[in-house]
Amino acid sequence: ILDQGPLFETGGSTSHAPGGVFQTNPSRMMCKFAQYTVDLLRSLSFEEKPCFHTVGGIEVSKTKERHEDLYRKLGIAHSYGLTDAKIISPDEVLKMSPFIDPEKIHGGYYVPTDGLAAPVRAVRAMAKYVTDLNAGEFIGETPVTGFKISNNQIRGVETPHGDYEADIVLVSTGIWAPKMGRLANISLPLVPCEHQMAWLEPFEELKEFQADHKEAQVEHALMRHQDYSLYFR
């Protein structure tokens, strides 16, 4: 496995991804993928630390229309295997997220098994599993600069540090996938999009949070507010 950055905090999204996992999705396949991801990450640990924190996920409704939509999502969740999903009252939301004003919401859609992944820790755990089995090698600081192709068949990849022979190449480069595609004369229809991230001052409601204790930041449920395209962790 080749990576253009240092292992395992590569400088890409793995090292600074929020890590929130909301499993409900109108696509059955995506919903099942999310459930599999949660099950996998919950089974992993690295240096005796978990790779997933099952803190639950809540989507709040500020309008009657949004609240009705939460019931639609509840039906989807139950039909796709998230049988523990439920609609909760504003006061129940407040118990899980102390910075919420219960007077301003109709309620929430709650999935207890949603949670927060520790992306770098999870990658380290999976890499250790592979290397312990001598099933693979991880090489950092090695960007792919080209593909060796003969008779429309992949033969290997080129890097600044030498070539690697391979009859199958799996491209898992995220936003850099179109660049990789161009190296192989293949069009990959993927467009990276920016979005905003805000760092907030401490909340009085969260004053017991200790900034020097990283695990403390995952004590409260993940929060999503779809009317404003926001989520909080």
Question: Can you say where each PLM-predicted feature lies in the sequence?
Answer:
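Glycine-rich FAD pyrophosphate-binding loop
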Residues: 1-14
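Short beta-to-alpha linker loops that shape the active-site pocket of alpha/beta-hydrolase fold enzymes
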Residues: 5-7, 93, 126
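Short, flexible, mixed-charge acidic loops at enzyme active sites
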Residues: 11-18, 99-101
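Dinucleotide-binding Rossmann-like beta1-alpha1 core, especially the glycine-rich loop
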Residues: 18-96, 229-232
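Active-site substrate-recognition segment that forms the wall
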Residues: 19-22, 32, 39, 43, ...
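A short, glycine/Asx- and small/polar-enriched loop/turn
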Residues: 65, 99-105, 148-155
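General beta-strand structural signal in soluble alpha/beta enzymes
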Residues: 86-89, 138-140, 171
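Helical element adjacent to the flavin cofactor pocket in flavoenzyme catalytic cores
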Residues: 109-168
